[in-house]
Amino acid sequence: MLAACGSSAKTETTKAAETTAAEDKATEATKAAVEAMSGDLSDKKVGICIYQFSDNFMTLFRTELESYLVSKGFKKENIKIMDGANDQATQTNQIENFITDKVDVLIVNPVNSSSAATITDKVQAAGIPLVYINREPDQDEEKRWEEKNWDVTYVGCDARQSGTFQGEIIADIGMDKLDMNGNGKVDYIMIKGDPENID
């Protein structure tokens, strides 16, 4: 059976990996936000919607994102970060408030990636550049952005590629270490995430 065991060394390694991943994604999201604007960034307003603050990775992410935005010239007081509390209606209301406040760019980690079309329509109607992070809208939605030449982008990982990498890591370990009960098979536990969001 393949299982994860806890130890302080592994926990520290995991935390370091999460922090590095959060830093990398925050950097990519900031670059996308900066590319969407021109001129002096110090007076630009940034609205950020996070699906849920209690998610540890997203806590690291939003901290790194804010820090990186400031390092690129945005003022901290012009960056507002909202907690969607894992409720799409709450997040939609926050997005509408950001539109009313006339933010210069909106960064959204959607509660439900299936809501992307509705979110995109609202934000594009207001003429605000939009950056989706971490939870990828479907391919049809991304194709629609290209066809309409909208100022919308997605920054995140390719879930299929991540699965391929995980499989390669397991294969590299080798059967002699993975076949713990000697039956010629690799036993494993599959942990599923949110079916609404494949990332």
Enumerate the language-model features and the residues they cover.
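A residue-level marker of the well-folded mature domains of exported/periplasmic proteins
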Residues: 3-199
